[in-house]
Amino acid sequence: LSLRSLNVPYLAAHPLELGMRLHDQAAAGADDDEAGASEPAPRLARLLAASPFDAAIHDAAGRLFERSAFQLYDEPSAAPSVDAWFPDGGAIAAVKRILRTAPVREFPATFVVGPGDDGIALVRLLSHWMVRRHYARVKLKLMGLDPEQDARRAAGIARAMDAGGAPRAWMCVDFNGAYPDADSLRTFLEEWRRDHPETYADLQYLEQPTSADSRGGEVDWRSGPPDKPVLLDEGLVGMEAFAEALERGWSGAALKTCKGLSFMLAAAAWATPRGALLTLQDLTNPGRAA
């Protein structure tokens, strides 16, 4: 039994194609007028609302054919909504090339330090999760109100790790698009490097330092790129935005299936041969299971 051999109208397209149609419709806000909304819903909210249906399409196809939905990428098929981005064999074949032959069963977990985490409580938290639970990665959320203040906070987190006996850790920083321009990020990096060079060396990448209200590519890093990779997060909303961002010096993107499994697969398949840095992020909070 194969996707092509089953002549059922509602399965006439590959799950990737159906998911990309859903993504494009949600990104464009195509249903807002029909729903009589007084103003369009935020684009990220629309993508988030649509994503469970995208996952359900893949899940339903996998159940129908009694195999992993990802095995449906083994067969050549058309995906007209996104094939134009893959002139060398189409999107289905491109996704197939980046899929692992076996799923990853274990991967490093990341401890997230929020804006309100501070003082002795933070020292205890870091000691618990990094020393006792063996977390080796830290994601630092910053408000982005003042780059010098943010740099001091980043260095303070590093000192809290030292005080709690935590080992050197892999680190990343997420600004949620708070900085107004590229110069603010450069100031942040310069101050952190000056204040705490040891942990600055552990900083791996930066997520969405500037606004995602418009296309992420509008900030141009080519004139003076930072010495750390800069990734799209909230700004990753479509293939066009991703392509423009890479042209303007962005390093890659944070992939989250909560914005659509099909789009994330297509984005990863398109970006991988171009050498973009990609991080796959799951928002699960393991709690005591960790």
Can you annotate each of these PLM segments?
Residues 68, 125-143:
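Catalytic domains of carbohydrate-active enzymes, especially glycoside hydrolases
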Residues 1-71, 75-79:
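Metal- or metallocofactor-binding catalytic centers and their adjacent structured scaffolds
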